[in-house]
């Protein structure tokens, strides 16, 4: 199979689903249906077949790459006459709102933990590095939430640099999708994992395309392997609207929810509001900031209907 996109054709090896699935080799399935149920996101229908066909081959590839990096590190440590370093392998997962980045990240974390070479796999989302809600309001960025300028990039880069340098304990802020804000006084501690998975909208950006301060390093400078989860925009908008309706029945019904005022909407009213949010915020962010970084990824997972992967593109 070859990509229709000439840039992708030049940069990537392209696999149809069936071609990719055979690359699983003999990797055993380590997740049960209950495990998968716990990993699924809102409005996603990931099956064990999807894990077998797409994620097991990917976990095998990543295991081989991480092992090679570890072996190279041992050689370098021996050459330099130093103790083995504790620098983790960093995998980033990028893509649009509603594409399923979080589910992809959780499944990969669960699978990679079962390889004996790297049992400690941590997952951090960049949501926690969004400026606090009060700061976004003060800066006039509330309608730009998710855009690069809405993140505390200095804090994010300092976090990832500390993890990469092998610092014993590094704290990351935690985000609540209920309050639409950082959780004050709470944090996630990352303690020298073998692998760190970093999931977020803008983790593939560089100084070439970001409106924030370009004089300091970007997250992408610290990443060893990057994944972009891709889908056509009409599907992304559809999934966002479906997810919005699910949230209206679930998280929005919580009186503490920032979006509690949406809980009483009819389906038609909710669809109109979700479409407007997509057209004014998520869609423009995808077109301006997220999709242009796609071809920087080492691997692209292309989704079709029902969140099913249709193609995999692997950097040559």
UniProtKB/Swiss-Prot annotation:
Pathway: Cofactor biosynthesis; coenzyme A biosynthesis; CoA from (R)-pantothenate: step 1/5
Top EC class, one word: transferase
Keyword Transcription among UniProt keywords: no
Catalysed reactions listed for this entry: (R)-pantothenate + ATP = (R)-4'-phosphopantothenate + ADP + H(+)
Ligand binding (ATP): 95-102
BP term (GO), one: coenzyme A biosynthetic process
Localization annotation: Cytoplasm
MF term (GO), any: pantothenate kinase activity
Annotated Gene Ontology cellular component terms: cytoplasm
EC identifiers of the protein: 2.7.1.33
Keywords, sorted A to Z: ATP-binding, Coenzyme A biosynthesis, Cytoplasm, Kinase, Nucleotide-binding, Transferase
Family, per entry: Belongs to the prokaryotic pantothenate kinase family.
Name the UniProt record assigns to this protein: Pantothenate kinase
């Amino acid at each position: 199979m070859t990509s229709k996109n000439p840039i992708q054709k030049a940069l990537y090896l392209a696999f149809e689903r069936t071609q990719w699935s055979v690359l699983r080799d003999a990797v055993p399935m380590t997740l049960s249906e209950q495990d998968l149920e716990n990993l699924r996101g809102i409005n996603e229908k990931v099956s064990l077949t999807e894990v077998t066909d797409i994620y097991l081959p990917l976990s095998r590839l990543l295991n081989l790459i991480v092992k090679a990096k570890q072996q190279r590190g041992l050689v370098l440590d021996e050459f330099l006459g130093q103790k083995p370093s504790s620098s983790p392998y960093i995998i980033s997962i990028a893509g649009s709102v509603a594409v399923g980045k979080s589910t992809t990240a959780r499944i990969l974390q669960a699978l990679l933990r079962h390889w004996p070479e790297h049992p400690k796999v941590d997952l951090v989302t960049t949501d926690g590095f969004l400026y606090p809600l009060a700061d976004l309001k003060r800066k006039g960025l509330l309608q730009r939430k998710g855009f690069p300028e809405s993140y505390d990039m200095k804090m994010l880069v300092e976090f990832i640099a500390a993890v990469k340098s092998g610092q014993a304990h590094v704290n990351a802020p935690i985000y609540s999708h209920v309050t639409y804000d950082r959780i004050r006084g709470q944090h996630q501690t990352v303690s020298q994992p073998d692998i760190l998975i970093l999931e977020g909208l803008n983790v593939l950006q560089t100084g070439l395309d970001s409106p924030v301060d370009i004089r300091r390093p970007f997250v992408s400078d610290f990443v060893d392997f990057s994944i972009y989860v891709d889908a056509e925009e009409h599907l992304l908008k559809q999934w966002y609207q479906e997810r919005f309706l699910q949230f209206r029945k679930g998280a929005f019904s919580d009186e503490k929810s920032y979006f509690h005022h949406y809980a009483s909407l009819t389906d038609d009213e909710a669809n109109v509001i979700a479409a407007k949010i997509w057209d004014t915020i998520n869609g423009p962010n995808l077109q301006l900031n997220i999709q242009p970084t796609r071809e920087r990824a080492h691997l692209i997972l292309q989704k079709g209907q029902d969140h099913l992967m249709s193609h995999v593109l692997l950097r040559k």
